[in-house]
């Protein structure tokens, strides 16, 4: 299984001949190396409804006839736009032909903001994502604060690789993320959701250097890990 980081919270997974992308915020993302029109996928996994995570989902999904796996309200909202979806909710798991997906709790918001019409549409609860394929589990925390049930996520799952936000302001910052690392007990941790905008500027190398109970690794944009 090959896992690639493409800036902000964009993660691509290649496994068993399938390509899965998590939170494909590409257009308007100054930290990505991908262009929406070039992305070929079989499935898209979404953690929540904010624009910097849903991103180019509709265009990519329609062009590839890809399924979008998302929290129920967000899946419904995208389905109304002609996207093929599979709705789920926190605590639920489903076995797809590309791997197993389970949604976990995340402490954040989830909405679609229409700046032009000044409206906000509720898109359900935010989620973290546990993805399992080839007998290995990846945890993508989505956008979240630190919460104590991360201990439960770590206790109940043998997590090979975790992507955790460290940007602060909108999510947990480096100090809280370091505690999350201990609770999740992943073998390797990669920071995400930082330096895309001035308000979430952080030093990811400083973060991973302080980790003592796992392998911390900063992935440059476009860099991959093979599990």
From Swiss-Prot:
Does this UniProt record's set of keywords contain Nucleus? no
Signal peptide range in chain numbering: none
Q: Which InterPro entries match?
A: Metallo-B-lactamas, RibonucZ/Hydroxyglut_hydro, UPF0173, UPF0173_UPF0282_UlaG_hydrolase
Question: What Pfam families does UniProt report for this protein, alphabetically?
Answer: Lactamase_B_2
What's an example of a GO molecular-function annotation for this chain?
Answer: hydrolase activity
Keywords on record: Hydrolase
SUPFAM superfamilies the UniProt entry points to: Metallo-hydrolase/oxidoreductase (SSF56281)
> Can you tell me which family this protein belongs to?
Belongs to the UPF0173 family.
What HAMAP family does UniProt report for this protein, alphabetically? Answer: UPF0173 (MF_00457)
This protein is called what? UPF0173 metal-dependent hydrolase Bcer98_3294
Organism name:
Bacillus cytotoxicus (strain DSM 22905 / CIP 110041 / 391-98 / NVH 391-98)
């Amino acid at each position: 299984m090959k896992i690639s980081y493409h800036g902000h919270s964009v993660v691509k997974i290649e496994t068993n001949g399938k390509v899965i992308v998590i939170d494909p915020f590409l257009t308007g993302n100054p930290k990505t190396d991908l262009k929406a029109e070039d992305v070929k996928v079989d499935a898209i996994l979404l953690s929540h409804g904010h624009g910097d995570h849903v991103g180019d989902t509709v265009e990519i999904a329609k062009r590839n006839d890809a399924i979008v796996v998302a929290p129920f309200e967000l899946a419904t909202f995208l389905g109304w736009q002609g996207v093929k979806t599979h709705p789920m909710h926190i605590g639920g798991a489903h076995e797809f032909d590309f791997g197993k997906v389970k949604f976990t709790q995340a402490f954040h918001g989830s909405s679609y903001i229409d700046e032009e019409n000044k409206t906000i549409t509720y898109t359900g609860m935010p989620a973290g994502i546990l993805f399992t394929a080839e007998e290995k589990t990846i945890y993508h925390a989505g956008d979240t604060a630190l919460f104590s049930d991360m201990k439960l996520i770590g206790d109940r799952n043998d997590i090979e690789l975790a992507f955790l936000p460290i940007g602060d302001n909108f999510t947990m910052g480096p100090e809280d993320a370091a505690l999350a690392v201990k609770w999740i007990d992943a073998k390797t941790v990669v920071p995400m959701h930082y330096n895309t905008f001035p308000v979430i500027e952080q030093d990811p190398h400083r973060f991973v250097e302080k980790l003592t109970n796992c392998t911390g690794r900063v992935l440059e944009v476009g860099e991959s890990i093979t599990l």
